[in-house]
């Protein structure tokens, strides 16, 4: 797995904090999909790991759960606090949660663990802080995500402008030894042009590359090349994500 610079990731998401919600349709769709795997279940205490501006922290709070919101980015956590999304707030890393073991009934993490250095370590931490009989519920992105972005940039400079995500088999391997249910789903978002599609990534802070550079500055000439190379369908510009959902039952 590529070396992960947590400080750079936190900075990228911090810059996106103020406009995150208006670009977060993927996060909303993936959260809704994960919720369907928890239908009918209630949780007295919830950890929202990678809470962002707190949309799902607020969701669980409004359903009577005592919520702890955790994020690596201080501006994101401040957004959640300003919205009174949770009861408690933790500026922390999912791979090193500063909490006792067996505290929460649900550890919820929506599209955050793909930013961790080691998926098994991240899931092990979430598992550690959940009580026996509790649940770890998470989503992440897997290999094959953002093919349109990759195809368009390939026509320009043949360099990686998106992070590589783990194949399904590697995520399954990270779940070994636990009682887990998993499901995969493709999600496609549609945009009016290629620039809007790329802005959606920047708007959620997802422009940091693990290789250590931010996405290159777009010139008009480059943008024209990308626009022409982007695969279109009925005049729209798709951006496809391969979503992996996992639910781990804590023994």
UniProtKB/Swiss-Prot annotation:
Keywords: Biotin biosynthesis, Methyltransferase, S-adenosyl-L-methionine, Transferase. SUPFAM superfamilies: S-adenosyl-L-methionine-dependent methyltransferases (SSF53335). Transmembrane segments: none annotated. Gene3D superfamilies: Vaccinia Virus protein VP39. One of its GO terms (molecular function) is S-adenosylmethionine-dependent methyltransferase activity. The keyword Ribonucleoprotein does not apply. Its EC number is 2.1.1.197. Signal peptide: none annotated. It comes from the Bacteria. Disulfide bonds: none annotated. It catalyses: malonyl-[ACP] + S-adenosyl-L-methionine = malonyl-[ACP] methyl ester + S-adenosyl-L-homocysteine. Belongs to the methyltransferase superfamily. Converts the free carboxyl group of a malonyl-thioester to its methyl ester by transfer of a methyl group from S-adenosyl-L-methionine (SAM). It allows to synthesize pimeloyl-ACP via the fatty acid synthetic pathway. This is Malonyl-[acyl-carrier protein] O-methyltransferase. The lineage of its organism: Bacteria, Pseudomonadati, Pseudomonadota, Gammaproteobacteria, Enterobacterales.
């Amino acid at each position: 797995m590529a070396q992960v610079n947590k400080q750079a990731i936190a900075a990228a998401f911090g810059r996106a904090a103020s406009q995150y919600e208006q670009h977060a349709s993927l996060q909303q769709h993936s959260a809704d999909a994960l919720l369907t795997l928890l239908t009918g279940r209630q949780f007295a205490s919830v950890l929202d790991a990678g809470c962002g501006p707190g949309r799902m922290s607020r969701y669980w709070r409004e359903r009577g759960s005592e919520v702890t919101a955790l994020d690596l980015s201080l501006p994101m956590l401040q957004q959640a606090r300003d919205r009174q999304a949770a009861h408690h707030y933790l500026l922390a890393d999912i791979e090193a949660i500063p909490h006792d073991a067996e505290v929460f009934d649900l550890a919820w993490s929506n599209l955050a663990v793909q930013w961790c250095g080691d998926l098994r370590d991240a899931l092990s931490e979430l598992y550690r802080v959940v009580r026996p009989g509790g649940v770890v519920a998470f989503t992440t992105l897997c290999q094959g995500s953002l093919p349109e972005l990759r195809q368009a940039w390939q026509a320009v400079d043949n360099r990686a402008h998106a992070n590589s995500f783990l194949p399904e088999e590697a995520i399954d391997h990270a779940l070994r030894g636990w009682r887990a249910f998993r499901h995969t789903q493709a999600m496609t978002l549609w945009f009016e042009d290629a620039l809007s599609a790329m802005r959606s990534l920047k708007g959620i802070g997802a422009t940091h590359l693990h290789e250590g550079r931010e996405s290159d500055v777009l010139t008009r000439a480059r943008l024209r090349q990308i626009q022409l190379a982007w695969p279109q369908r009925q005049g729209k510009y798709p951006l496809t994500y391969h979503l992996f959902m996992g639910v781990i039952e804590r023994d």
